[in-house]
From Swiss-Prot:
Pfam families in alphabetical order: Pro_Al_protease (PF02983), Trypsin (PF00089)
Full protein name: Streptogrisin-A
Originating species: Streptomyces griseus
Job description of the protein: Has a primary specificity for large aliphatic or aromatic amino acids.
Key words, A-Z: Disulfide bond, Hydrolase, Protease, Serine protease, Signal, Zymogen
Length: 297
């Protein structure tokens, strides 16, 4: 897995808003003069529909190395730009929102957004390495979920044979175990112990999470955004991602994102590293489970 501009992680954040404020000075002025002064109306925030239109405008601007999500509660779009995005490209994004009520917040991320190829443990094909996300059952048969940008590489893997893959747009894939007895429903924590996974769920902003991957082991952090769109440049665009501040590096792609015994996501990509930190994106696992009719072991 190699970091590109916003790209997936295989080998397995948005922006300034101006507020119109009626200060106490207005009230003071009203008291000091005989005539009443009407307080200015508060600026209305963007609606869900307007936010969706603004998100589509950013998508059409097609700036590689950017990722963004909307906040209906604030009327904002939060956009994260990796180190490859120039000021001119950020201006292109801003211009795309000209006339929109959506407020843009821009954050910077170190390094490139890229997919990382290099249950957390390593799976390999040819010269590429990714990480296993979660072992699952499909009609009673043991399979493994990982990142789609990993399963796109080859049909034959160290643990079995690919039976499905979806990337770009999504980032999930599934491999049928050649040795079903080896399929463990737990996630390896890289300290000699394992975490039982008993269910799958949906992440929420602020949630404390952990990620397991074959390059950097077990790492912790929190969810910073949901339903993020990530432009990985030539690798493609993915939608509906979970955004976090958990670090990851090439080879962690496809690895497990979880909270306690709940499976949450599959490592897609990001920027930075585990020395200086980073921004990462994850395919929601519930979508992958639904696509393949699978359940966690």
């Amino acid at each position: 897995m190699t970091f590109k501009r916003f790209s997936p992680l295989s080998s397995t954040s948005r922006y300034a808003r101006l507020l119109a404020v009626a200060s106490g000075l207005v009230a003071a002025a009203a008291l000091a003069t005989p005539s009443a002064v009407a307080a200015p109306e508060a600026e209305s925030k963007a609606t869900v529909s307007q936010l969706a239109d603004a998100s589509s405008a950013i998508l059409a601007a097609d700036v590689a190395g950017t990722a963004w999500y909307t906040e209906a509660s604030t009327g904002k779009i939060v956009l994260t730009a990796d180190s490859t995005v120039s000021k001119a490209e950020l201006a292109k994004v801003s211009n795309a929102l000209a006339g929109s009520k959506a407020k843009l917040t821009v954050k910077r991320a170190e390094g490139k957004f890229t997919p990382l190829i290099a249950g957390g443990e390593a799976i390999t094909t040819g010269g590429s390495r990714c990480s296993l996300g979660f072992n699952v059952s499909v009609n009673g048969v043991a399979h493994a979920l990982t990142a789609g940008h990993c399963t796109n590489i080859s049909a034959s893997w160290s643990i079995g044979t690919r039976t499905g893959t979806s990337f770009p747009n999504n980032d999930y894939g599934i491999i049928r175990h050649s040795n079903p007895a080896a399929a463990d429903g737990r996630v390896y924590l890289y300290n000699g112990s394992y975490q039982d996974i008993t269910t799958a769920g949906n992440a929420f902003v602020g949630q404390a999470v952990q990620r397991s991957g074959s390059t950097t082991g077990l790492r912790s952090g929190s969810v910073t955004g949901l339903n993020a769109t990530v432009n990985y440049g030539s690798s493609g665009i993915v939608y509906g991602m979970i955004q976090t501040n958990v670090c990851a590096e090439p080879g962690d792609s496809g690895g497990s994102l979880f909270a306690g015994s709940t499976a949450l996501g599959l490592t897609s990509g990001g920027s930075g590293n585990c020395r200086t930190g980073g921004t990462t994106f994850y395919q929601p696992v519930t979508e992958a489970l639904s696509a393949y009719g699978a359940t966690v072991l």
